[in-house]
Amino acid sequence: MTGLLLKDIRKSYGAVDVIHGIDLDIKEGEFVVFVGPSGCGKSTLLRMIAGLEEITGGDMFIDGERVNDVPPSKRGIAMVFQSYALYPHMTVYDNMAFGMRIARESKEEIDRRVRGAADMLQLTPYLDRLPKALSGGQRQRVAIGRAICRNPKVFLFDEPLSNLDAALRVATRIEIAKLSERMSDTTMIYVTHDQVEAMTLADRIVVLSAGHIEQVGAPLELYERPANLFVARFIGSPAMNVIPATITATGQQTAVSLAGGKSVTLDVPTNASENGKTASFGVRPEDLRVTEADDFLFEGTVSIVEALGEVTLLYIEGLVENEPIIAKMPGIARVGRGDKVRFTADKAKLHLFDTNGQSYRA
């Protein structure tokens, strides 16, 4: 089994550049998730790794071998798509065996791999069924099993859960997590726009925007220490609250004046040259707490209350023009619409970004 190395990978369609010099080193056995909004280039990058898209510039290495000009079938890669791509007239067994038959593997080897993959994915009772007799989640497991049978160097998943309903999505996500544990030596790359999938499955997450890598890191690293405003607002749901601010004091701690005049001190170091500059103050909804103390972070009027049972979302007006601040309270919050509420948060949970959106913590 092997890793994958991307060096200055670029992709253009005519005069339009869509992937801009990607550098990424994926180690053997890593589960790496590409995540980002629609149009960020994550699926294009995955297709380039698979050999389905030509590489415009840069070098790609699999197992130390440069594969820019190696056809997809020779790269040692198996891919699972959003659509299951199963042959409707073939049984589950035949669908899983098809690629090996084309490769002229022996009947004994085909049977061993198919039954091994079926046992791993709990598909053994369904081997004689046609795809139409399976649920969506079972069909996706067949597609994954077909990929396992190829014994690939690298697994590629292109939004494999997008066609499933919420309950099946959770169940299949758990199956993929178990698969990753059982095949711990196999490198896996997974594309999704769903941050829950990214946070729960990945060893490392690659956040992409407009064909650029914004940040690479472990899930909690991206959540707790976002490199910039884009990552801060993309990772986490609801998104991080961002309030315009002005830096009023610098040093090992930084003081800022928030929109509305409230002064806040953060455990974030800044240089003296930053004094007087505009900045963006950030705090996650789940890090806010209601307080009655005079030493509060900010206050505002509750415009909407969404009581979800497990949590309550409070939408606060009056701090940012045309955008409410969101507070995520555990359980049932005894707060009503129209109430004026004060909020606080631990200093360690506060973020500050410069005029270019880069974190002062980085």
Swiss-Prot record:
Residues 4-235 form the ABC transporter domain. It comes from the Bacteria. It is a peripheral membrane protein. The keyword Amino-acid biosynthesis does not apply. Pfam families: ABC_tran, OB_MalK, TOBE. InterPro entries: AAA+_ATPase, ABC_transporter-like_ATP-bd, ABC_transporter-like_CS, ABC_transpr_MalK-like, ABC_transpr_MalK/UgpC-like, Mo/tungstate-bd_C_term_dom, NA-bd_OB-fold, OB_MalK-like. ATP binds at G36, P37, S38, G39, C40, G41, K42, S43. One of its GO terms (molecular function) is ATP hydrolysis activity. It is found in: Cell inner membrane. GO terms for cellular component: ATP-binding cassette (ABC) transporter complex, substrate-binding subunit-containing; maltose transport complex. SUPFAM superfamilies: MOP-like, P-loop containing nucleoside triphosphate hydrolases. Gene3D superfamilies: 2.40.50.100, Nucleic acid-binding proteins, P-loop containing nucleotide triphosphate hydrolases. PROSITE patterns: ABC_TRANSPORTER_1, ABC_TRANSPORTER_2. This is Alpha-glucoside transport ATP-binding protein AglK.
